[in-house]
Amino acid sequence: MNFKYIVAVSFLITSGYAESVKNDEQSLSQRDVLEEESLREIRGIGGALLSVGKSALKGLAKGFAEHFGKRSAEDHEVMKRLEAVIRDLDSLDHPEEASERETRGFNQEEIANLFTKKEKRILGPVLGLVGSALGGLIKKIG
């Protein structure tokens, strides 16, 4: 009788243990499913926020580029003049190359007159452009 009692108790313990393991597995799988769903939701929300942030930054960058990148016709002309002045100044930095290119066949006096005229032609617009650029900056700041 003791043997039957031990077997019956062992059977009850194993079946109880098996059922608790089964319940644990189910609760773990349910918990895993819930965690996975919540992670998907969080990822979805995070992805949406990230895409909104990216588009906002792109829009902001585009707005800044449009605002600060716009040039009026007057600004465009000023920039063209500045580029021409810079080219002329570059030719003054290398007078040998400029004189070879521009003044072939002139005598020394004509070359001296040409450089004097070129210096006058450069300094006038440069001072005017610098003054107008500073004036424009002061107006925009003020």
Curated annotation (Swiss-Prot):
Keyword check for Glycoprotein: no
Main location group: secreted
One GO cellular component term noted in the UniProt record for this chain: extracellular region
Stretch forming the signal peptide: 1-18
Keyword Secreted among UniProt keywords: yes
Keywords: Amidation, Amphibian defense peptide, Antibiotic, Antimicrobial, Cleavage on pair of basic residues, Cytolysis, Fungicide, Hemolysis, Secreted, Signal
Modified residues annotated as Isoleucine amide in this record: 141
InterPro entries from the UniProt entry: Bombinin (IPR007962)
Residues where Phenylalanine amide is found: 68
Tissues expressed in: Expressed by the skin glands.
Protein's name according to its UniProt entry: Maximins y/H11
